[in-house]
């Protein structure tokens, strides 16, 4: 049907209708896919927040120093971003100084940072690392391994463009969700059928 519609004469009413129908369906699919990608990015960012909290807790438990996590994370970022520290990447991507870098990273980079955090936290615990130099070395190593995996697939995290601010994305998704109907009627359930649209 799609090929017939696409190759048919749009002056014929049926063909014009079919072409319009398929164009609308294609656009709907594009919008659904874009929304799913946005939700995936938001979920990845939330997982990164959780892994950063876990790693921060593990580091604080061992070092009893509130600033050590930021130093260790920045050195890990330098390993992931080809020598660029957290501050360097913020400047490179135009991220406001008071905002987290990860709020402006694309999904793949967020997931890369999350994996490196998980690896570091796991190894700090299992190897019972208790000094800042050893934990830093572990985190740098985890980020380096993740960077190498990305590089083998032709991905350089520092060369990826910034993504939309995750806060704006979250607000837009929340707003869009509130605009959705509370209950979507099932096929064949229109007002007037089955007692005014209520389920049978």
Task: Identify the residue ranges that each predicted region occupies.
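Positively charged, phosphate-engaging catalytic surfaces used for nucleic-acid and nucleotide handling
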Residues: 1-200
